A protein has these predicted regions:
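N-terminal small/polar loop signature for handling phosphorylated ligands or for N-terminal nucleophile
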Residues: 90-153, 243, 248-306
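An N-terminal, well-structured beta->alpha segment
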Residues: 3-106, 197-224, 235, 493
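Phosphate-binding and adjacent anionic-ligand microenvironments
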Residues: 287, 291-293, 297, 306, ...
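Gly/Ser/Thr-enriched, mixed-charge loops and adjacent short helices
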Residues: 12, 16-20, 36-41, 45, ...
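Glycine-rich phosphate-binding loop plus the immediately following alpha-helix
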Residues: 159-187, 319-320, 324-348
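Short Gly/Thr/Asp-enriched flexible loops that form oxyanion-binding sites at enzyme active sites
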Residues: 102-110, 152-160, 240, 302-322, ...
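Conserved phosphate/anionic-ligand binding catalytic regions in large, soluble enzymes, centered on
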Residues: 41-61, 146-147, 231-243, 380-382, ...
């Protein structure tokens, strides 16, 4: 076994076109480090609907030049099989380590495969790439990014010609095309590709501002708003400033330590606004400048977190606020959220007499909601992803969402209110919707399958003392590996994480609110019920 592994490693190295990666594998082979080689050769990175994502390291189980070369070749072969040879492909990249290199490698491979390749002019946010695919009429797009993953990761995200992420079976077909690709060193390359000008960012900025129509908020109200902001060491700052300026806002006060792109993300443990401590510097800045609202984007700026009054809002709270804002503006069509997101948005939509839809998890599904009669006009998921302008970007977009939050906050401030006040008003109108998670990390993945089997075979009949109905979402179309327990004012959805060895239960309880005085009591009761719901679900799962 050891000799076979060493031979496999040396064979991979011989076919690796990157000198540094080749030397890395050979050094491990020469040292006889079979434990590390087993990790590197445990199997190729899985190409899923979000593309590739993994640690930066040599070998088939890492993000490196050889893996990206074969991924680009597989993507090109799949596009060719669909009749797209000669079409345009747009490639973007963030500021993570080797992102620019992987973008260049992809351009060389796809150009040699017969595609008209254009690369974004510099590290830019993922929403700019998603916009460019549709704006330029490309047949596909590639974004080299690992979004909010740890610093040592990178990724390879693929968009179809409509500017949306892949859905099955395209991911499996591309994965098969990658597997059928020969050694990376033998993949043809060409320098016959181009670089887009800065006007692509300008076009994105103009499209976002046009879609959200800031002129509906008086100029004085926009200029009176104080916004604090952080890019979390990512690539969002420049584009976000341009959008805010074009919309008539003053420049946001930015966390200086986190403003410039830095692939080491030195001030945070994880560059994810959801993680504890990630927005501490933003909170301090917001207090220092007296910000009306504070916004944190993740490193590729496709998600954003909102802070008001020293409190970080949940994704469900922001999702409901933005839906309510658009509905009060008269934006009609389909409002969609993923099945693990909260229910308040649907209650608001129903009150306005508009269609709302629940989709499987992920923006790849949210963006496909809607009909000809009621096209998608808004979508969100609880993990801080929002689409306030799906006509511009068919994916989550933290920059346009940030502008939407600022416009909402400016409108409210003009009336002497804040976004927290509007949340209280929504609670009085619809009830207090309290959402949270039970998340269990495991070392042994069989614990997850065992827990799901236990829940399917013996689901609880009640939660919080209320009868609940059980639904196995694996039996629906499209099938989802999840179960739902739904009762009057209580809900639990349980599924394995798609990216981590975790089992997640998404929990919700609804507490009636009868008057202003009842808000505080309702929040206390909601917190208690959420704690009880966590305990009941942990017991039901045997965890």
């Amino acid at each position: 076994m050891t000799q076979d592994l060493l031979a496999t490693a040396r064979s991979w190295a011989a076919a690796d076109p990157h000198e540094g990666d080749r030397a890395e594998i050979l050094a491990l082979a020469d040292a006889g480090d079979t434990a590390e080689l087993e990790r590197r050769f445990a199997g190729p990175l899985t190409f899923g609907t979000a593309g590739l994502r993994g640690p930066l390291r040599a070998g088939p189980a890492g993000m490196n030049a050889a893996v990206v070369t074969r991924a680009a070749a597989g993507l090109g072969a799949w596009l060719a099989s669909a009749g797209h040879t000669g079409g345009g492909v747009v490639i973007g990249f963030d500021a993570r380590r080797r992102s620019d290199e992987f973008a260049r490698v992809s351009a060389e491979v796809l150009s040699a495969a017969g595609f008209a390749v254009q690369v974004l002019p510099r590290p830019l946010p993922t929403p700019v790439l998603a916009f460019a695919v549709r704006h330029l009429g490309a047949v596909a797009g590639v974004m080299v990014t690992a979004s909010h993953n740890p610093p040592d990761d990178n990724g390879y995200k693929v968009y179809l010609g409509d500017g949306a992420q892949l859905v099955p079976p395209a991911d499996r077909e591309i994965e098969a095309a990658i597997a059928a690709t020969g050694p990376a060193r033998e993949v043809p390359r060409s320098d016959d590709w181009g670089t887009l000008g800065d006007d692509i960012e300008t076009d994105y900025v103009d499209a976002v501002v046009r879609a959200l129509d800031p002129g509906r908020v008086p100029a004085a109200d926009r200029s009176a708003l104080t916004v604090a902001y952080t890019a979390l060491h990512g690539v969002g700052a420049g584009t976000t400033r341009r959008v805010f300026a074009a919309a008539g806002f003053g420049e946001p006060a930015s966390v200086p330590e986190q403003d410039a792109p830095d692939p080491a993300f030195p001030t945070v443990a994880f560059p994810n606004p959801e993680e504890p401590g990630a927005v501490d510097l933003l909170l301090a800045l917001a207090e220092r400048v007296g910000a009306d609202v504070a916004i944190a984007e993740d490193p590729d700026a496709d998600r954003c977190s909102v802070v008001c009054g020293g409190r970080q809002l949940t994704g469900d709270e922001v999702g409901a606020l933005l839906a309510d804002w658009l509905l009060r503006r008269g934006v009609r069509g389909t409002y969609a959220s993923s099945l693990v997101s909260g229910s308040l948005m649907h209650a608001i939509a129903e009150a306005h007499g508009v269609v709302s839809a629940e989709t499987p998890t992920g923006f790849k599904w949210i963006m496909r909601a809607g009909t000809d009669a009621a096209p998608l006009v808004y979508g969100y998921e609880e993990a801080l992803g929002y689409s306030v302008a799906p006509s511009v970007v068919r994916d989550k977009d933290g920059i346009s969402a940030a502008l939407g939050v600022a416009l909402l906050a400016a409108e409210l401030k003009a009336g002497g209110r804040t976004v927290l006040d509007r949340l209280d008003e929504l609670a009085r109108e619809h009830g207090l919707f309290v959402t949270g998670q039970l998340s269990v990390r495991v070392e042994d993945l069989t614990l997850i399958s065992d827990a799901m089997a236990r829940l399917r075979s013996a689901p609880p009949a009640t939660l919080l003392g209320r009868p609940v109905e059980f639904a196995d979402l694996a039996l629906e179309d499209p099938p989802v590996d999840a179960v739902r327990l739904l009762g009057d004012g209580v809900r639990a959805i349980v599924r394995p994480s798609g990216t981590e060895p975790k089992l997640k239960a998404y929990l919700e309880t609804v507490v009636p609110v009868h008057d202003d005085a009842g808000i505080i009591a309702a929040r206390g009761r909601g917190a208690d019920e959420l704690d009880q719901l966590r305990a009941e679900m942990a017991s039901a799962l045997g965890l």
